[in-house]
Amino acid sequence: MAIDYSKWDKLELSDDSDIEVHPNVDKKSFIRWRQRDIHEKRAVRKQKMEDIKGAMAMNRRLLSRISEMETVLEKESPSDPYVLLGSFLEAKKSEDMDSAIPGGMSYHHMLMSLLKVIKDAEDTTEEKSMDDSDKCLRRLKSHKERLLKLLEDAQKEYDTLEAESKNYITSEDLHLGFDSTYVQKKEPEKPKKTKTKKETIQVIESLNNPTPPTDFPGAKEQASTGNAPKNPVNENESEDEEGLSLSEDGKKFANIDFGDYSSSEEFLKEHLNILADEEESDAILLEAFNAELEGKPSLAKQYVHQALLISYCRQLGPNGLSIFFQKIKDPNHQSQRLFLEDVHNTYVRIHERSAAISKEQAESGEGVEQIQLCAVDPNTKLSITIPEAGSTDPETQKARAAFESFPPNLQKALMTNDLDKINVVLGKMAVENAEEVVEKLSSTGMLSIEEGIIDTTKGETIPQLS
């Protein structure tokens, strides 16, 4: 097969050109001279083409205005055409004040000069028998024809120069054939939620050392949980679970119906950040586990289905999304059967584990987490002060409003100032509500601490309000 070298025909000169030069002339110097000559001629040609384009644009605009002047004369046929055309050009002055060439005459001045040339021109033999209007019209048409001829010649010269510039390849002719770039904008990372650890401290009172250490946190009062965790391993597991936070996009994806693969595919393509976060599928599986514990098996299975979709698509990568969903949408394809089997097996494991946890909790009799009030220092005592009703003091009014916002049974317990009765009521309340009650008691001053002075002669503690 013959090799086609025609694509190199447009190379005007190259460093390895087979050029025969005089023996006294260095070939490299000759090639450099030829290159400089080519670039100079190319620059001159380019500038000439720009000048021709500018002249053509100027002549087209002048031609347009001369045609308007012709139309005005043909319609009016005045006795003094130059006054009429002068008025017409003055009316168009604001439009024609820009210059065709930077630093040159404006279009208005060029047209006024043309009108003066037409007026001062000597009459020809044919024009002697014409009136002024016909003379002016004839001379305008003559200038119009001259401009048309100039435009035609300029266009031919421009086409010749353009064809000459395309005879050889230049750097200006090089351009990108096609380019396809896809940039996936990474969504800003959402700040991770700080894990809140609930610290449970067990205080063992000793007869030999009744005074707690001075650096014990909350040395004056403590709101702690009533039941300490019995299994430290379970506590670590709960902390890991609390660290998994489901993003807003993850929540929306998890709530897509089971088997709605079209919506799932579209959502994942628009939110590729879900695939980038490896904890997203684990967080959805945790939601499935919680739903199963709450007795919502359908919702739990849906969450498992969506979590495994994320897991599969993350392994395939963004380019494999379309292929994966194309196969999984086909009920006769093996991929759908294998995927649904994986969903079923994962759900069964979650179901069995949640059932085992429920059974363990029932058998161990673990109570609900409670908030209790207790004094850490044995020499101190917690005391409740009920604010007076109808007081004019703003702080007392604020405390009274907080007291009246409590449930009636809690108000009765607080009025007894008996810590055991108060703790019974707090133990029956939800943890969040009980914490809010303790916060209000402390902030309004209803909860105070009584410090005692030990009378060594009688072995009694003398209460003293702090």
From Swiss-Prot:
The modification Phosphoserine is found at residue 238. GO terms for biological process: cell division; protein folding; protein stabilization. Residues 204-249 are annotated as: Disordered. It is found in: Nucleus; Cytoplasm. The gene is cdc37. SMART domains: CDC37_C (SM01069), CDC37_M (SM01070), CDC37_N (SM01071). It comes from Schizosaccharomyces pombe (strain 972 / ATCC 24843) (Fission yeast). One of its GO terms (cellular component) is nucleus. This is Hsp90 co-chaperone Cdc37. GO terms for molecular function: heat shock protein binding; protein kinase binding; protein-folding chaperone binding; unfolded protein binding.
